[in-house]
């Protein structure tokens, strides 16, 4: 769990982001640049809350759930509660972390699965990939680079 908190601590700050997404169905590519400010969410008084961060209107929170934790071959897995302003319902995400520089999220929304991997190349360069599948068929992929300023 310390590795996850360390990853979130390293993510705090202002970032310039460049994301490129490729949709396989129509072979269309788009790129988006944005600025992200990641800061801790101190508005929660939940005693089960381990860590919480906000990316603008999006927040990710790690809630203690000792029944859903697994430690296998140095890979720590647990469930993450994910909420945002558009959907008040919490989504449970399987989160895996192997060291303080690499974290993966696997989220299911009905027949759609999103696999995300984030890692630090250096302290001020964070990279990520996302694979979106519908009915186990890949429909889109994306790559993102973020530079801390």
Curated annotation (Swiss-Prot):
* E.C. code: 4.-.-.-
Reply yes or no: does the keyword Plastid apply: yes
What family classification does the UniProt entry report for this protein? Answer: Belongs to the CpcS/CpeS biliprotein lyase family.
Q: Name one GO molecular function term.
A: lyase activity
Q: Which InterPro entries match?
A: Calycin, CpcS/CpeS
The identity of this protein, by name, is Chromophore lyase CpcS/CpeS homolog
Q: What does this protein do?
A: Might function to covalently attach a chromophore to Cys residue(s) of phycobiliproteins.
Q: What lineage, starting at the top, does this entry show?
A: Eukaryota, Rhodophyta, Bangiophyceae, Bangiales, Bangiaceae
Compartments reported by the entry = Plastid, Chloroplast
Keywords of the record, alphabetical order, are: Chloroplast, Lyase, Plastid
GO CC annotation terms, alphabetical: chloroplast
């Amino acid at each position: 769990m310390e590795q996850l908190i360390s990853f979130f601590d390293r993510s705090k700050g202002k970032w310039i982001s460049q994301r490129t997404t490729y949709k396989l169905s129509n072979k269309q590519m788009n790129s988006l640049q944005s600025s992200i400010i990641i800061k801790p969410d101190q508005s929660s008084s939940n005693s089960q809350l381990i860590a919480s961060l906000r990316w603008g209107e999006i927040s990710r929170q790690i809630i203690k759930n000792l029944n859903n934790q697994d430690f296998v071959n140095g890979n720590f897995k647990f469930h993450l509660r994910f909420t945002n302003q558009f959907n008040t319902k919490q989504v449970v995400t399987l989160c895996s972390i192997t060291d303080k520089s690499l974290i993966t999220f696997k989220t299911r929304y009905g027949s759609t699965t999103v696999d995300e991997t984030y890692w630090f190349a250096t302290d001020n360069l964070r990279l990520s990939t996302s694979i979106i599948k519908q009915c186990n068929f890949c429909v889109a992929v994306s790559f993102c680079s973020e530079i801390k300023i």
